[in-house]
């Protein structure tokens, strides 16, 4: 995770510092693209190491389905999913208003009409997802992180998969068994959770819901 000032954090709903946008050139879904980033969000300088590790480890997304990205700044994950699977419905969930608007603007600039960026409360309660990719905001603290995962991981549709990237030294190895216990309590016998890979100090975690 990047360092942020004490006055405004990337997980605040409304960052207090005035917005300063800039254009960053990066590579998403095998394409060189230009995206808008800004201060007061996660990883404003471009693609962070954790998300890059996730991209290197996950299998290609299905061509169709309902996909979810939970909280990752200017949403390189959601943009990548929408670019790679143009017939899929991609939802980016964020609490940071600046990130939400950047995601919408970047999606529009890239012609991605299959991507919507929403606050958590605007996602229908009965919505389920075939695929979740996420670099969850570990620095929000354990209680808030657990609440976030409890809210979204059970939303996997039957046969769906979630892929998470968590830095090893930020608690990945203790988070995995907690995820397994939480899902077993919520839906006994329906979910499995495993460490799928390790990439440059990051754990890639995989959650699967049975069909």
What annotation goes with each model-predicted range?
Residues 50-134:
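Conserved SAM/SAH cofactor-binding pocket of Class I
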Residues 38-56:
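Conserved SAM-binding loop and adjacent beta-strand
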Residues 167-182:
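Conserved class I S-adenosyl-L-methionine
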Residues 146-158:
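A short glycine-rich, Lys/Arg-flanked "PGG" loop and its adjoining helix->strand segment in the class I
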Residues 159-166:
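Conserved beta-strand signature within the Rossmann-like core of class I S-adenosyl-L-methionine
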Residues 1-29, 40, 44:
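N-terminal auxiliary segments of SAM/dcSAM-dependent transferases
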Residues 195-211:
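Core SAM-dependent methyltransferase catalytic element
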Residues 81, 151-152, 179:
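Class I S-adenosylmethionine-dependent transferase superfamily signal
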């Amino acid at each position: 995770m990047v360092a942020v000032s004490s006055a405004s954090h990337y997980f605040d709903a409304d960052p207090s510092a005035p917005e300063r946008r800039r254009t960053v050139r990066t590579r998403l879904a095998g394409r060189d693209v230009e995206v808008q980033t800004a201060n007061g969000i996660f990883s404003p300088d471009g693609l962070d190491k954790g998300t890059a590790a996730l991209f290197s480890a996950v299998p290609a997304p299905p061509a169709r389905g309902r996909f979810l990205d939970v909280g990752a700044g200017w949403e390189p994950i959601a943009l990548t999913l929408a670019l790679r699977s143009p017939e899929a419905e991609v939802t980016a969930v964020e609490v940071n208003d600046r990130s939400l608007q950047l995601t919408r603007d970047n999606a529009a600039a890239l012609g991605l009409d299959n991507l919507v960026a929403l606050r958590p409360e605007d996602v229908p309660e009965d919505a389920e997802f075939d695929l979740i990719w996420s670099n969850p905001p570990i620095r929000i603290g354990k209680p808030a992180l657990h609440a976030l995962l409890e809210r979204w991981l059970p939303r996997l549709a039957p046969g769906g998969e979630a892929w998470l990237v968590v830095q090893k030294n930020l608690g990945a190895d203790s988070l995995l068994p907690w995820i397994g216990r939480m899902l077993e309590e919520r839906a006994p016998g329906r979910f499995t959770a495993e460490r799928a890979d390790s990439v440059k100090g990051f754990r890639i975690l995989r959650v699967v819901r049975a069909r």
